[in-house]
A protein has these predicted regions:
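An amphipathic, aromatic/His-enriched active-site/gating alpha helix that lines ligand/cofactor pockets
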Residues: 56, 60-89
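Short S/T/G/P-rich N-terminal loop/turn motif that feeds into the first structured element of a domain
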Residues: 1-51, 62-65, 84-125
Protein backbone atom coordinates (compact mmCIF):
# COMPACT_ATOMS: atom_id res chain seq x y z
CA UNK A 1 0.00 0.00 0.00
CA UNK A 2 1.29 3.43 -0.84
CA UNK A 3 0.99 6.34 1.54
CA UNK A 4 -0.73 9.64 0.92
CA UNK A 5 1.44 12.68 0.17
CA UNK A 6 0.23 16.03 1.53
CA UNK A 7 1.67 19.18 -0.03
CA UNK A 8 0.87 22.25 2.02
CA UNK A 9 1.33 25.80 0.87
CA UNK A 10 0.97 27.97 3.98
CA UNK A 11 1.02 31.66 3.18
CA UNK A 12 0.21 35.21 4.14
CA UNK A 13 -1.56 36.72 1.13
CA UNK A 14 -0.37 39.90 -0.50
CA UNK A 15 -1.93 41.65 -3.47
CA UNK A 16 -3.27 39.49 -6.30
CA UNK A 17 -3.59 40.61 -9.90
CA UNK A 18 -5.01 39.16 -13.12
CA UNK A 19 -1.86 37.15 -13.85
CA UNK A 20 -2.00 35.57 -10.40
CA UNK A 21 -5.60 34.44 -10.86
CA UNK A 22 -4.85 33.08 -14.35
CA UNK A 23 -1.84 31.07 -13.17
CA UNK A 24 -3.60 29.91 -10.00
CA UNK A 25 -6.49 28.53 -12.06
CA UNK A 26 -4.16 26.78 -14.50
CA UNK A 27 -2.16 25.22 -11.66
CA UNK A 28 -5.30 23.98 -9.90
CA UNK A 29 -6.65 22.54 -13.15
CA UNK A 30 -3.37 20.76 -13.88
CA UNK A 31 -3.04 19.40 -10.32
CA UNK A 32 -6.61 18.07 -10.23
CA UNK A 33 -6.06 16.32 -13.57
CA UNK A 34 -3.04 14.35 -12.39
CA UNK A 35 -3.60 10.61 -12.06
CA UNK A 36 -2.42 10.62 -8.45
CA UNK A 37 -4.50 13.63 -7.36
CA UNK A 38 -6.88 12.94 -4.46
CA UNK A 39 -8.17 16.35 -3.37
CA UNK A 40 -7.30 19.88 -2.30
CA UNK A 41 -8.42 21.58 0.90
CA UNK A 42 -8.10 25.23 1.81
CA UNK A 43 -8.00 26.60 5.33
CA UNK A 44 -7.87 30.12 6.75
CA UNK A 45 -6.49 30.98 10.19
CA UNK A 46 -9.11 32.23 12.69
CA UNK A 47 -7.82 35.79 12.34
CA UNK A 48 -7.82 35.54 8.52
CA UNK A 49 -4.13 36.41 8.28
CA UNK A 50 -2.82 33.07 6.98
CA UNK A 51 -4.11 30.56 4.46
CA UNK A 52 -3.20 26.94 3.82
CA UNK A 53 -3.81 25.08 0.56
CA UNK A 54 -3.29 21.35 1.07
CA UNK A 55 -3.03 19.12 -1.98
CA UNK A 56 -3.31 15.36 -1.37
CA UNK A 57 -1.71 12.93 -3.82
CA UNK A 58 -1.39 9.15 -4.04
CA UNK A 59 2.27 9.27 -5.09
CA UNK A 60 5.41 11.39 -5.38
CA UNK A 61 5.33 11.07 -9.17
CA UNK A 62 2.29 13.37 -9.20
CA UNK A 63 3.94 15.81 -6.79
CA UNK A 64 7.00 15.97 -9.03
CA UNK A 65 4.83 16.52 -12.12
CA UNK A 66 3.14 19.47 -10.41
CA UNK A 67 6.51 20.89 -9.35
CA UNK A 68 7.71 20.79 -12.99
CA UNK A 69 4.51 22.21 -14.51
CA UNK A 70 5.57 25.33 -16.49
CA UNK A 71 2.91 27.64 -15.02
CA UNK A 72 3.89 26.50 -11.54
CA UNK A 73 7.52 27.40 -12.28
CA UNK A 74 6.43 30.87 -13.46
CA UNK A 75 4.35 31.37 -10.30
CA UNK A 76 7.30 30.36 -8.11
CA UNK A 77 9.40 33.10 -9.70
CA UNK A 78 6.74 35.67 -8.76
CA UNK A 79 6.13 34.53 -5.17
CA UNK A 80 7.35 37.80 -3.59
CA UNK A 81 4.99 39.73 -5.84
CA UNK A 82 1.84 38.01 -4.51
CA UNK A 83 2.66 36.82 -0.97
CA UNK A 84 3.94 38.53 2.16
CA UNK A 85 5.36 35.23 3.43
CA UNK A 86 5.04 31.50 2.74
CA UNK A 87 6.17 28.02 3.72
CA UNK A 88 5.96 24.74 1.79
CA UNK A 89 5.48 21.47 3.67
CA UNK A 90 5.57 18.15 1.85
CA UNK A 91 4.72 15.27 4.14
CA UNK A 92 4.02 11.59 3.78
CA UNK A 93 0.96 10.50 5.73
CA UNK A 94 1.97 7.07 6.98
CA UNK A 95 -0.70 6.66 9.62
CA UNK A 96 -3.84 8.22 10.99
CA UNK A 97 -6.36 7.31 13.64
CA UNK A 98 -9.76 8.27 14.98
CA UNK A 99 -13.14 6.82 15.81
CA UNK A 100 -14.01 6.24 12.15
CA UNK A 101 -16.91 8.71 12.17
CA UNK A 102 -15.20 11.77 10.69
CA UNK A 103 -16.13 12.04 7.02
CA UNK A 104 -13.04 13.90 5.88
CA UNK A 105 -13.09 13.85 2.05
CA UNK A 106 -9.53 12.72 1.29
CA UNK A 107 -9.79 9.86 3.78
CA UNK A 108 -12.92 8.50 2.08
CA UNK A 109 -10.93 7.89 -1.11
CA UNK A 110 -7.71 6.79 0.52
CA UNK A 111 -6.40 3.24 0.89
CA UNK A 112 -5.00 4.52 4.19
CA UNK A 113 -8.55 4.89 5.55
CA UNK A 114 -9.45 1.34 4.56
CA UNK A 115 -6.28 0.03 6.21
CA UNK A 116 -6.84 1.94 9.44
CA UNK A 117 -10.57 1.36 9.82
CA UNK A 118 -10.02 -2.30 10.66
CA UNK A 119 -9.57 -1.32 14.29
CA UNK A 120 -5.85 -0.81 14.61
CA UNK A 121 -4.67 2.39 16.25
CA UNK A 122 -1.53 4.04 15.07
CA UNK A 123 0.06 7.46 15.44
CA UNK A 124 0.41 10.40 13.13
CA UNK A 125 3.92 11.06 11.80
Amino acid sequence: MSNVIACQFVFEPGEYDEEFHRLDGQIDEFASGLEGFISVHRWVSPDGRFKNSIYFFKDMKSVQALAKFPQHLVAKQEVKRWYKSYQILITEVTASYGDGNLQYPWMEESPLRRKLMIGSFSHIH
